Amino acid sequence: MKRPRAPSGSDGESDGPIDVGQENDLSQMARPLTTPSPSQMQARKKRRGIIEKRRRDRINSSLSELRRLVPTAFEKQGSSKLEKAEVLQMTVDHLKMLHASGGTGFFDARALAVDFRSIGFRECLTEVIRYLGVLEGPSSHADPVRIRLLSHLKSYAAEMEPSPTTTSALAFPVWPWSFLHSCPGLPSLNSQLAILGRVPGPVLPSISSPPYPISALRSAPVHRPAGTIPPTRRNLLPSRGVTSTQRAHLPERPAAPPPTALDARAARSIVPIPPCSPTTAPGAGKSDDNVSGSISSPCPSGPTGRPAGAVFYHSWVSEITEIGAF
């Protein structure tokens, strides 16, 4: 749009049209910045509401955690609804108490475990009450089963208080021996339990130990008659070397018949020698009943590696010594 310029008295100015359309365009562009449209205003209000709701949710979540963690606030939950200012005040008082006590109660693992158990039970009780109310509706408040159930749970929750027993009385019982015997890969479990202090060290079971204390084995008699050993166990026990200090009485072995052509003096001075001719103990010539275990010498052996004519025999002494040494 062009309009003619008004005539002026000066001759130096040129007469020509002036463009005014650009001014109208600038005025139309500046109008939305001052007055937003209704859709933009609605979107802005919606964003503000979402941000404010998130902020309130964070505050309420933190306050609910404080109600659960602070003991005084947790105990007053059932009686009446706590305000936010009361919860904050109880939190401040609790922190002051912990700071004054040096934090000893805060780091007590057993007290924390008992406290969290009580808190968890009460939360479960609250969830049960809420679920029954949602499932049955308002008409279920007079249900006798519901009343008895809630009464029992509330009375049990009221009785849940920390017991004065010490942590040493809460040790776990010893595991069954059959379980340890069936698991040969657990030899290091005994040392771990002994370090924890839950099971006394001398009574710990091992893979090859019987289910009674080791001290009872060490006090057992060293010499035991061979006749008291059951024949089945005598045949099943493996053969072990017997030292000179732990020898047991062996049964009488068949000896070769003495020569008949010698006189009485020679017969009294000669000791009967078995076919395998082992090196016998010094007192073997006095009595045949006191023959002890001997050191093996080169002689013919049986199919199992034992000397010919040897008897399957095992004494309790070697087993006791090996168990005690283990």
UniProtKB/Swiss-Prot annotation:
SUPFAM superfamilies: HLH, helix-loop-helix DNA-binding domain, Orange domain-like
GO biological process: atrioventricular valve morphogenesis; cardiac epithelial to mesenchymal transition; cardiac ventricle morphogenesis; cellular response to BMP stimulus; endocardial cushion morphogenesis; epithelial to mesenchymal transition involved in endocardial cushion formation; glomerulus development; mesenchymal cell development
Biased composition (Low complexity): 292-305
Swiss-Prot/TrEMBL induction comment: By activation of the Notch signaling pathway.
Domain Orange: 116-153
Domain spans labelled bHLH: 43-98
A GO CC term attached to the entry: nucleoplasm
Keyword match Glycoprotein: no
Residue span of region Transcriptional repression and interaction with NCOR1 and SIN3A: 42-111
Region (Disordered): 1-56, 223-260, 272-306
Pfam families assigned: Hairy_orange (PF07527), HLH (PF00010)
Gene Ontology MF term list: AF-1 domain binding; DNA-binding transcription activator activity, RNA polymerase II-specific; DNA-binding transcription factor activity; DNA-binding transcription repressor activity, RNA polymerase II-specific; protein homodimerization activity; RNA polymerase II cis-regulatory region sequence-specific DNA binding; sequence-specific DNA binding
Keyword tRNA-binding set for record: no
Keywords associated with the record: Developmental protein, DNA-binding, Notch signaling pathway, Nucleus, Repressor, Transcription, Transcription regulation
InterPro entries in alphabetical order: bHLH_dom, HES_HEY, HLH_DNA-bd_sf, Orange_dom
Location in or out of the cell: Nucleus
Tissue: Expressed in heart and at lower levels in brain, lung, muscle, ovary and testis.
PANTHER family: BASIC HELIX-LOOP-HELIX TRANSCRIPTION FACTOR, HES-RELATED
Subunit structure: Interacts with HES1, HDAC1, NCOR1 and SIN3A. Self-associates. Interacts with GATA4, GATA6, HEY1 and HEY2.
Role according to the record: Transcriptional repressor which binds preferentially to the canonical E box sequence 5'-CACGTG-3'. Downstream effector of Notch signaling required for cardiovascular development. Specifically required for the Notch-induced endocardial epithelial to mesenchymal transition, which is itself criticial for cardiac valve and septum development. Represses transcription by the cardiac transcriptional activators GATA4 and GATA6.
Remaining remarks: Expression in nascent somites is reduced in mice lacking Notch signaling.
Family: Belongs to the HEY family.
Name of the molecule in the record: Hairy/enhancer-of-split related with YRPW motif-like protein
The encoding gene: Heyl
